[in-house]
Amino acid sequence: MAFSTIVVLFVAAVGFGNKISSADTCPEFGEWKPWTECLWYPMQNIYDKMTASCGLPGHRNLTNILPLPPGFTIPPPCGHCSFKTRCRTRPKKEGCYPFDGEREICHEHGDICTIAKLPGIGCGWTVLQEVVKQCLSRPDIPEYMRAGYKKLFHMLPKGHCIEKDNQCKCCCGDYEPNEDGTECVKQQDHQCAPFNEPGDWSECLWFPLADMFKKVQSHCGVEGKPEGLSPSSLAPAGFQIPEKCGFCSFRLKCQSREKKEGCFPLKVDKKSCGAEDCPTCGDVCTLDKQNNSCAFTKAMGMKFWNSFAHKAKESNLAHWRRDGYADLFKFLPYGHCKEVGDKCKCCCHPYEPNEDGTACVVKQYCKSLEEVGGKKQQKDQPESEKKAENMPETTGNASHHQHRHHHGDSSSESHEQHHHHHHH
């Protein structure tokens, strides 16, 4: 839906903002280009209009990022999720983003969105946002690029959905559904403190899940259990945890802020561990089938998120706490497995097994312009600029915009109840 596509879009479309590097000065931006119309789905429509408006090269097919339910229809613009955008550019320089963008929400489209549930994840439509956002967890992305994209992603309007009468009722940004699911209401402004500067990256984390969470708590300085929401192992009986593999091991970087009602005190950033981090980290995972199938990783992910949603509802968790915990749990690796003979060959997002299951390759919509053949690198460009220039298309020509009228770090983070398929 709206919020999810917005992500896919802006990653490459507008998603380059201010300087995030040690570069001393960046060139000035040129004049703003005209505003687009109020953009709306399907995703391809938003992307095409944004790239045309911003004068960005390249084409990407965004129609198959997430399979939709049979008979799914897109509602008219709604939920404060439609938006218009404009762009400006500046000369390329190492360490400086060449594009800048800003967005205005089309509040005239403020009726609550009514959307069909997704198979397996119900009203977790913001899974799309997370799927695209984690294209940036690739270990080969330069650090200043990762920081820049992260900053811009925080400017995206986040989706808030509830289930009502077997349908999803959704709103975006500063608005959330009321209890009856009949209208979008403005959230209370809790005046949350800003987050501290992020700490260092953790070691490469790995299963079992209980050990992983202990290390996360220690690294982030979190005490106690998260109100009964701490995940337990979901692995089938007798499941053998392999060595780190499949880009499924990862590092975390934490940011904290003052505890206050309505303000979740912690957020994390994630980076996959690859071949430079450990000898097997980038190798495809080879796992035994479970019940003669390779679908068990998906089943474990669904079980985890369904359990989380049930516990949150059972304990009547405030939406800002629920969304905050979901935002933390989203860092769990979710994988894609391919059946090869009597084994499962698995890799974790943003990677998937290649055709014969011998290696992990970047998913198509997470590839850079050069990787999809849309652009040739210039031999005389600095290495760091080559990477920076190519990564925009990584997060998929998706939807990454810089939002100047931004919602800030509001009390509510999107709840990515999600089909994380983890290997544990």
Swiss-Prot record:
One of its GO terms (cellular component) is extracellular region. Residues 372-390 have a biased composition (Basic and acidic residues). It comes from the Eukaryota. Coiled coil: none annotated. It is found in: Secreted. Glycans are attached at N291, N397. Glycosylated. The keyword Secreted applies. Residues 1-17 form the signal peptide. One of its GO terms (molecular function) is zinc ion binding. Residues 372-424 are annotated as: Disordered. Binds iron and zinc. May bind nickel. This is Poly-cysteine and histidine-tailed protein. The lineage of its organism: Eukaryota, Metazoa, Ecdysozoa, Nematoda, Enoplea.
